[in-house]
């Protein structure tokens, strides 16, 4: 199986705009994305007004289908709100997870 990764970097005009976006996205998208096949979603902050999102899908067609449902319109609306958007995507060449149990952080 070849997993597909879509990474999006957003640069907002302010920290408030970034936090508003994250709040709205988390409440409306999480469950639906997982129902549509999303395997993993990671967000990380690179600055007070910037965030990077990483989405791992089972394949490109699943990622593209979900993008057509919500992503294209969302990205257009964000661009119109002066949000800088950079997208990177492709087939994942390696997907490894550490087998160590991290539930006990004292290990």
Model feature map: region roles:
Residues 1-51, 58-72, 79-107:
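Short S/T/G/P-rich N-terminal loop/turn motif that feeds into the first structured element of a domain
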């Amino acid at each position: 199986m070849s997993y597909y990764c879509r990474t999006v970097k957003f640069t907002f005009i302010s920290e408030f705009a970034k936090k508003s976006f994250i709040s709205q996205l988390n409440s409306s998208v999480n469950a639906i994305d997982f129902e549509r096949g999303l395997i993993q979603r990671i967000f990380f902050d690179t600055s007070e007004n910037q965030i990077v999102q990483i989405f791992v899908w089972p394949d490109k067609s699943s990622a593209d289908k979900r993008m057509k449902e919500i992503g294209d319109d969302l990205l257009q609306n964000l661009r119109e709100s002066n949000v800088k958007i950079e997208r990177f995507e492709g087939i994942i060449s390696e997907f490894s997870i550490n087998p160590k149990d991290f539930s006990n952080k004292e290990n």
